[in-house]
């Protein structure tokens, strides 16, 4: 059967595109997902259903692609990505945070004039039901969207949240009541898409609205070998995909092919299909359909590591209780980039992996330091021409000295907060970052290189931009330059990573490009 739209990847954006495009009953949509699909909340495995109220680990789950990457100094880090309907929104930390106004206005200034903050504001509101502002949403919040957003009221904050906030306020950071309002900075409650601890993914919020439709077909456990092209005309046109289901190959045709496989899957699939840097494709014997140098380049993420404190025996630690309640956004001293630093205060910290993993024996609390708008960029390359093999990810993390300077200063700022009376009241010691690691810039850099990981916000690997930008892969409507019938709509098209967790922004990309398609762009 031939479909109007074949969407590859049922993740944060793909599930939204499928839901919005299938609102027209005259259009047939096929949504393909590499991982499994679950019909409802009650069917979800524990590690997918619950954000942190889980005793099982998402890290080693079949619902995680379990990628590896080189971070810095040859170190290997884990890169979890969702392999299930809902994509990474179904396995992430449920932080429902918008970028700041300038993030999106910068996209517009880079030649994507329909992506400014004011253009996107209706979509931020459209995707959400913000329980905090439900009765009075105003101009900056939604009260009728598919994704439920909550915050922990101050009177429910755990000791670590309270102590960290007190210390940050006394250090001069302002209080931020609403981190999703435009141009906010400071310390305050963290917005989360986890009502009652349930990870409210796009599979729940969006596919829950659309999976009954007869014009939407959802097929799970399907891998894609490559996109097919008709090259008989002047401009190659995407006509379908070769899909593998239970070991059997199928050719699926569509009037338009939309790749929403994420910032790793989408550029990998493009290159396997002959769309990417020509010399790199030829290394693996792949016929080049279109030489697009920007595919896999410009890789961005947020370097992140934890400063952990062992708490006193009197402080109760619940490994399946609230893990995240407050955050701090601030501008590094001497930085020209506003809000270039972010801190997530975490409860039930341990030696174990932190994000999404509650199968731990907690020892205390921690502050996760993230660097926004890193100047260092990474790249994604093929590891082989086999669609079953993972790509090679080199994050090139903190390679720029200004990145390292800002990060060093951020670690020292967090350490300084431990001297506040509220922090001293609950912490016993700092077990993993020793005083000797702080004695010099060189010692601290060495510690950072051994410990830094990622906030799991990989993006920008097939960025959108005007055709005059040699590294732009798509135009601002998501259409791949120099090809017909092929569109991208996920974190890969971001021109620059936002100063926030990216899940909200990726959902907005799904909504925005769905509207572009409906409008005939």
Region annotations inferred by a language model:
Residues 1-521:
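N-terminal redox-cofactor-binding region of secreted/periplasmic oxidoreductases
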């Amino acid at each position: 059967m031939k479909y109007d739209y074949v969407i590859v990847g049922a993740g944060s954006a793909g599930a939204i595109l499928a839901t919005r495009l299938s609102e027209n009953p005259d259009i047939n949509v096929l949504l393909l997902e590499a991982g499994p699909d679950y019909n409802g909340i009650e069917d979800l495995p524990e590690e997918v259903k619950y954000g942190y109220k889980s005793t099982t680990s998402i890290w080693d789950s079949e619902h995680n692609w379990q990628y590896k990457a080189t971070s810095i100094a040859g170190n290997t880090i884990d890169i979890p990505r969702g392999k299930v309907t809902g994509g990474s929104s179904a396995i992430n930390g449920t932080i429902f945070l918008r970028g700041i106004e300038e993030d999106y206005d910068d996209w517009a200034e880079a030649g994507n004039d329909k992506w400014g903050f004011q253009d996107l504001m209706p979509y931020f509101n459209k995707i959400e039901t913000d329980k905090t502002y439900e009765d009075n949403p105003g101009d900056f919040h939604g009260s009728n969207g598919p994704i439920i957003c909550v915050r922990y009221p101050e009177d429910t904050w755990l000791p670590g949240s309270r102590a960290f906030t007190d210390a940050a306020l006394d250090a001069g950071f302002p209080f931020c009541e609403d981190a999703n309002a435009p141009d906010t900075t400071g310390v305050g409650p963290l917005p989360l898409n986890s009502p009652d601890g349930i990870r409210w993914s796009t599979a729940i919020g969006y596919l829950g609205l659309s999976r009954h439709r007869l014009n939407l077909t959802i097929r799970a456990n399907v891998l894609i070998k490559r996109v097919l092209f008709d090259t008989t005309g002047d401009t190659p046109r995407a006509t379908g995909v070769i899909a593998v289901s239970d070991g059997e190959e199928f050719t699926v045709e569509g009037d338009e092919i939309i790749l929403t496989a994420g910032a790793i899957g989408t550029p990998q699939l493009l290159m396997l299909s002959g769309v990417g840097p020509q010399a790199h494709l030829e290394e693996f014997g792949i016929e080049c359909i279109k030489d697009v140098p920007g595919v896999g380049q410009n890789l961005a993420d947020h370097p992140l590591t934890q400063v952990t404190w062992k708490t006193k025996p009197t402080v109760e630690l619940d490994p399946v209780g609230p893990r995240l309640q407050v955050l701090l956004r601030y501008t590094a001293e001497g930085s020209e980039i506003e809000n270039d630093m972010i801190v997530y205060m975490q409860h039930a910290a341990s030696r174990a992996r932190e994000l999404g993993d509650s199968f731990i024996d907690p020892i205390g609390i921690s502050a996760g330091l993230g660097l926004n708008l890193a100047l260092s960029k990474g790249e994604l390359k093929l590891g082989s021409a086999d669609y079953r093999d993972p790509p090679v990810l080199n994050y090139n993390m903190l390679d720029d000295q200004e990145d390292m300077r800002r990060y060093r200063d951020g670690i020292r700022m967090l350490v300084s907060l431990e001297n506040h009376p509220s922090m001293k009241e609950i912490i016993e010691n700092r077990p993993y970052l020793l005083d000797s690691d702080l004695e010099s810039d060189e010692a601290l850099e060495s510690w950072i290189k051994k410990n830094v990981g990622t906030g799991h916000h990989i993006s920008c690997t097939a960025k959108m931009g005007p055709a005059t930008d040699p590294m732009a892969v798509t135009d601002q409507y998501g259409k791949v330059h120099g090809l017909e019938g092929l569109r991208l709509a996920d974190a890969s098209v971001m021109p620059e990573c936002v100063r926030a967790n990216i899940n909200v922004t990726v959902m907005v990309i799904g909504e925005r490009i769905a509207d572009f398609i409906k409008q005939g762009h």
